[in-house]
């Protein structure tokens, strides 16, 4: 099989753009896993906050300038990662918007250069914007074409094609059944042969709700991804299960209920978008968002890029980045003296810095509760303030001692709320 390389002049230009973005404080990819296995870092060892979005059809259903709009708007909203299916939704044989099918004669061993040149162009735009694509190069619906016999060769080919592109993570989507294990191992082996281990590898079981835990011990699995679909109540326990597995690996809540999705039996409002995300992060995971109109490629896909839920997750990211050493977050429900809850769809959750430098409490609805102030061990005096997850606006509560128990009630009129406790400076 022939591999098309990026022309030298264009490659050099992209390197310059990439270097410029790095100097501006952008992460330097490819992505790596931290030494403690809890979070992601760039090539300089700097922690990277995984806030992802979902654009399954980006390679197949959009013109190049439309893809550019999506990527640029996605990055501007604060998302650093985008989940994309290499062959799009379906069985892997549907042509792209230009009429090009992925494979000649539907054979993965004879890839169609016309299809993959378009993928190349989209990948380059993502690289220019320093947006990492989590590229699903196998889906269980592709199983009639990607088989145990050709999986390694197919994976090696695609990995070689993008072996020097830093803004890629490899992903696969099997069913969570042991019968898929041999195929996943062949695919992973092909990816490693093709790119020499340059990119991280993961998989996300489909359908939901399932984590990747049934192959957690596999050496090639760099981090674990799960999906919960409409079962919001499954997020916290599933993340907790994965978080506590050994060896320690980062956990990503990769797919929940899409904003404005119509198939869940309830309206996925911005509040539900926020709840899913905060449940993920305060359980110790990372998170990916999705909008119904984007993955379905509805006529309103462009408006969906500015959906309230997407905007409010950008606010979430800023809230976390404002916490000193946010990457040392530890889920800890013992922060609550009373009022914490991890069961059901409306939760009250707490997490803290591993050394007690701050405490974060998320309330899924109006709530009264009490806090063990001794969980904040840095300094003697503690300041408390509310943050409205919808707007990011803060409201001072007061100062307290870091001993004993203090009671709090979230502000009236707020749908949900964050309470932050930090040492007085």
Identify the function of each model-found stretch.
Residues 19-20:
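N-terminal signal peptide c-region/cleavage motif recognized by signal peptidases
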Residues 28-234:
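Active-site mouth of glycoside hydrolases
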Residues 167, 173-308:
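Extracellular glycoside hydrolase catalytic/binding regions
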Residues 249-250, 259-261, 271-398, 409-425:
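Aromatic- and carboxylate-lined catalytic core of secreted/periplasmic carbohydrate-active enzymes
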Residues 72, 158-160, 211-216, 240-242, ...:
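Short, flexible, glycine/charge-rich loop motifs used to bind or transfer phosphoryl groups or to couple energy/partner
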Residues 1-12:
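Bacterial N-terminal signal peptides that target proteins for export
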Residues 24-77, 356-357, 371, 376-397, ...:
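Non-catalytic accessory regions flanking glycosidase/transglycosidase catalytic cores in CAZymes
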